[in-house]
Amino acid sequence: VRYESVAKHAGLTEDEVKNNLMFTESKKIGQQMVSSMDPNDASRWFGTAIPDLTLTARLKNGGGDWIYTYLKSFYVDDSRSTGVNNIVFPDVGMPHVLVDLQGLQKANFKVETDADGNEHRVFEGFEQIEAGSMSPEEYDSMVRDMTNFMVWASEPMKLERQRLGYWVIGFLVILFVLAYLLKKEYWKDIH
């Protein structure tokens, strides 16, 4: 998504975008928004490149729901290099970047035995260990807003494409009717 597109859809002026979203002087309003983190640095620091969640929003079925749940499912795990793990994406390399807002939570598991006698850990829920700077309701609202933005940023023209699609289908239906009538006219002498 481009800075200009965000400004247009959010009703922001060019100066508001430059002052609040563009953090380098060399950027122009028509350029794409990209991560400021170098993928090589991310691989060195976290063991893997950080995922682009806007692509996840577009490619996964129910991508918005997945991102929302993912951002709320980090828990403390001392065995991981980042100190956290995730219920939705186990052993993820991404750190919990929103930990100051959400706080720390512990995942509670119970052990169940299946019909074959194999034991499995089953997630039961989270327990808050340390409060963040936001209440749970505020954090939920903020994550919902972030998720909605990422879903929109994954395909900014989606609403326009869908609106235009009805006109295209309507045109094709009319064209089909005209082609059918023309075919009947051409073939009436043969039948």
What is the role of each PLM region?
Residues 161-191:
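Juxtamembrane interface at the cytosolic side of transmembrane helices
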Residues 2-131, 140-144, 150:
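Extracytoplasmic electron-transfer domains, predominantly the class I c-type cytochrome c fold
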Residues 128-130, 157, 184:
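C-terminal lobe and adjacent flexible extensions of AdoMet/dcAdoMet transferase-like proteins
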Residues 75, 151-154, 182, 186:
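Hydrophobic/aromatic-lined pockets within catalytic cores
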Residues 123-131, 135, 151, 162-174:
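C-terminal low-complexity, acidic/polar tails when present
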Residues 136-160, 164:
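Juxtamembrane amphipathic/hinge helix adjacent to a transmembrane helix
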